[in-house]
From Swiss-Prot:
Record's keyword annotation contains Protein biosynthesis: no
GO molecular function annotations of the record: membrane insertase activity
Organism lineage string: Bacteria, Fusobacteriati, Fusobacteriota, Fusobacteriia, Fusobacteriales
One GO BP: protein transport
Family to which this protein belongs: Belongs to the OXA1/ALB3/YidC family. Type 1 subfamily.
Main subcellular location of this protein, as a coarse class: membrane
Gene: yidC
Pfam families: 60KD_IMP (PF02096)
Subunit structure: Interacts with the Sec translocase complex via SecD. Specifically interacts with transmembrane segments of nascent integral membrane proteins during membrane integration.
Lipid bilayer topology: Multi-pass membrane protein
Gene Ontology cellular-component terms listed: plasma membrane
Protein name (record): Membrane protein insertase YidC
UniProt keyword annotations, A-Z: Cell inner membrane, Cell membrane, Chaperone, Membrane, Protein transport, Transmembrane, Transmembrane helix, Transport
Amino acid sequence: MSYIYNLLKQFLAFLLNTTDKYVGNFGISIIIVTILIKIILLPLTLKQDKSMKEMKKLQPELEKIKQKYANDKQMLNIKTMELYREHKVNPLGGCLPILVQLPILFALFGVLRSGIIPADSSFLWMRLADPDPFYVLPVLNGAVSFLQQKLMGTSDNAQMKNMMYVFPIMMIVISYRMPSGLQLYWLTSSLIAVIQQYFIMKKGA
């Protein structure tokens, strides 16, 4: 697994450096490569969303089965699998796309943390190898994180509602000392995720 991860890192490092040679700015290279990766992974994102929607539709029937066979675990499992087969739903369908995406996104994150960003490279007001001096990127990352959770919908659970406000603050605290290049990747990736989520929800409406 580590061998595949290292290969991914080498490929992504090559992609970043090659893009930088053509565009002449490492910040723009980070944005372009992040967008490219997100586009490549879009079919998996759509597949994951479709699988999650199918599972959501089955929830009322799954609850009935759970109540009916609450004291018979074996029959509960049999009836649950029968329901999945009947509706041609794979319960792991929502997990598999994530398992494919995560190594790629972590590899890109790892490449940017490894010192690949040239020490003298800059983008807008910031030096990419240093933290954002005005803390604009950490605040934007927190705001986009909040927007992302709002798009996904609020839960009736009080703890989950609190997390919707706590998590963006945690994002700001975690990221404010990170190199600006890493924060730029994080922001670009999150913004694309928000745009994707918006259009997926609009399509399903």
